Amino acid sequence: MTDPLSRAGLVIVDKPAGMTSHDVVSRCRRIFSTRKVGHAGTLDPMATGVLVIGIERATKIMGLLTLTTKSYAATIRFGQSTSTDDAEGEVLQTISASHLTEVDIEAAVAGLRGDIAQVPSSVSAIKVDGQRAYKLAREGQSVELAARPVRISRFDVLAVRGSGEDLIDVDVEIDCSSGTYIRALARDAGAALGVGGHLTALRRTRVGDFGLDRARTLEELADGATLTLDLDSACRQGFPRRDLDAAEVDAVRNGRPLAPAGIEGTYAAVDADDRVIALLADKGSRTTSVVVLRPANL
């Protein structure tokens, strides 16, 4: 019998510039001939790179996967600040950056490494009074967002070069926690240097365990709609494992709890055929089902 979950899994897409993350979801719906498609970790339209897409029943695990670390390659332009903190916004101010040295730039970058409190860009998806901040900002309303803790574990300067008479472009690589706004790092580094700054290029190179080496373009997927990881492989890779006997499999498929496993957090409950039956979590003296992937009625 054909496994009903054979079409479910993860696809790692190399998002092109000019498309929203939802645009990519829409394309994947057509490519994989299903409405059940979702994504984890939004990328701005100007950005390219790794976007994790869930197909069919894999959409149920997207919020559970550990995708808390991200890596980027970016270019920051010093000497101009913009309304969006990137190249798509209106230039608000231009101040000559020609006097800046590599030592100056490294000092500004160093001040943004480690655990910091970051004020997100006003043009962001954060909700303010029930509305997205970017919507309010584009309507001309003043948006004030609270600082939030983020971790910048790597912020390396790769190259410094002139861009015109007064501007300087700096290529950087960044490893950071989920929720970090790279545009805000560009803004804050420019502010620290007293000349303003904004992002001119952004490429996400890694999300969690998924890097560009596993990513495929939409054109490649259109030529062959294959999963990067099927649902079982994604769960076995993304969560601790608990092996079940036949009686335990029957219990889980029918919504009955098991004795706790002593495993911290969410874990994959796997049958003798290496299929993931459910994602479970211990709760006191029993398990609770986080999501049952293969219920009895499937």
Curated annotation (Swiss-Prot):
Example of a GO biological process term: tRNA pseudouridine synthesis
Alphabetized Pfam families for the sequence: TruB_C, TruB_C_2, TruB_N
tRNA processing found in the keyword field: yes
Reactions catalysed, as given in the entry: uridine(55) in tRNA = pseudouridine(55) in tRNA
Top EC group: isomerase
Gene3D superfamilies: Pseudouridine synthase (3.30.2350.10), PUA domain (2.30.130.10)
NCBIfam families: TruB (TIGR00431)
Known role: Responsible for synthesis of pseudouridine from uracil-55 in the psi GC loop of transfer RNAs.
PANTHER family: PSEUDOURIDYLATE SYNTHASE TRUB1, TRNA-PSEUDOURIDINE SYNTHASE
Name of the protein in question: tRNA pseudouridine synthase B
Species this chain originates from: Mycobacteroides abscessus (strain ATCC 19977 / DSM 44196 / CCUG 20993 / CIP 104536 / JCM 13569 / NCTC 13031 / TMC 1543 / L948)
Gene: truB
